[in-house]
Curated annotation (Swiss-Prot):
It is an enzyme of class 2 (transferase). Signal peptide: none annotated. This is 2-dehydro-3-deoxyphosphooctonate aldolase. Belongs to the KdsA family. It comes from the Bacteria. The lineage of its organism: Bacteria, Pseudomonadati, Pseudomonadota, Betaproteobacteria, Burkholderiales. One of its GO terms (molecular function) is 3-deoxy-8-phosphooctulonate synthase activity. HAMAP family: KDO8P_synth. GO terms for cellular component: cytoplasm. It holds the Pfam family DAHP_synth_1. Keywords: Cytoplasm, Lipopolysaccharide biosynthesis, Transferase. One of its GO terms (biological process) is keto-3-deoxy-D-manno-octulosonic acid biosynthetic process. The keyword Cell inner membrane does not apply.
């Protein structure tokens, strides 16, 4: 699959989607994006900057949601223009899709909306590449149905059917907890879409702090290493200069100062994993 000018897939080094969870300020976006560009450029990692203009899914009605679509897209557009970076952001309603697609390079669907057929159809018909997140409630094999819906919608409009990625972000494991079954990354290859692993939302503790979600950021490197060892096309990681002060998902954000070391480790694992292909493909049932 071609994405933002580079090739992605299991026969390519992983690409990275990274940035703060939510647009907090123009300065934070520019500084974080600039640092990530320096890191990924030095390591040769294809990079897409991400951040959300609105976090519609929050634990509490008083939680910070973001600057809104108009201001948020204005800030993201500046990042793209001044740093020459491709952008990804999530959309939560059909009404926003056209406006958002006019600014960003890649759309993302929230995990909770993966079974909303009309929404998936609308996003798929935007003409943009889409990172489709697997719901925490969904079996990995069921993502084939979701990707098939997206492809059918694109085909109906004469658009590129190979414009979709399947993203794993953990599965509900009792109350206020998620678990990552690494088999899902191999199972989701059956969609014939590039598989992306969300290493930061996978360590989230949803609603685990009463009016906000908790997280185990110390487990991000653990799960990221495991995912790369399985073999993925891309990684998704939220990062922040000071996670303790982040306005959204700070407990599961990677401290920006640690991103380079983590990515260096993951690159080495990626090379080993992809050197001789995937033995599981020849093992059979």
């Amino acid at each position: 699959m071609k994405l933002c000018g580079f090739d992605i897939g299991l026969n390519q080094p992983f690409f990275l989607i990274a940035g703060p969870c939510v647009v907090e300020s123009e300065q934070l976006q520019m500084d974080t994006a600039g640092t990530l560009k320096e890191i990924t450029s030095s390591l040769g990692i294809p990079f897409i900057f991400k951040s959300s203009y609105d976090k519609a899914n929050r634990s509490s009605g008083t939680s910070f949601r973001g600057p809104g679509m108009v201001k948020g897209l204005e800030i993201l557009a500046k990042v793209k223009r001044e740093l020459n970076l491709p952008l990804l952001t999530d959309v939560h309603s059909e009404a926003d899709i056209a406006t958002v697609a006019s600014v960003v390079d890649v759309l993302q669907t929230p995990a909770f909306l993966c079974r909303q057929t009309d929404f998936i159809h609308a996003v798929a018909q935007s003409g943009k590449p889409v990172n489709i997140k697997k719901g925490q409630f969904l079996a990995p094999g069921d993502m084939k149905n979701v990707i098939d819906k997206a492809r059918a919608a694109a085909r109906e409009k004469g658009l590129n059917e190979d414009n979709f990625m399947a993203c794993e972000r953990g599965a509900s494991f009792g109350y206020n907890n998620l678990v990552s079954d690494m088999r899902s990354l191999a199972i989701m290859r059956e969609t014939n879409a590039p598989v992306v692993f969300d290493a930061t939302h996978s360590v989230q503790l949803p609603g685990g702090q009463g009016t906000s979600s908790g997280g185990q950021r110390e487990m991000v490197p653990v799960l990221a290493r495991a995912a790369v060892a399985v073999g993925v096309a891309g990684l998704f990681m939220e990062t922040h200069p000071d996670p303790a002060k982040a306005l959204s998902d700070g407990p599961n954000a990677v401290p920006l100062k640690h991103m380079k070391a983590l990515l260096e480790t993951l690159l080495e694992l990626d090379r080993v994993t992809k050197k001789n292909g995937y033995l599981e493909n020849s093992f059979g049932a």
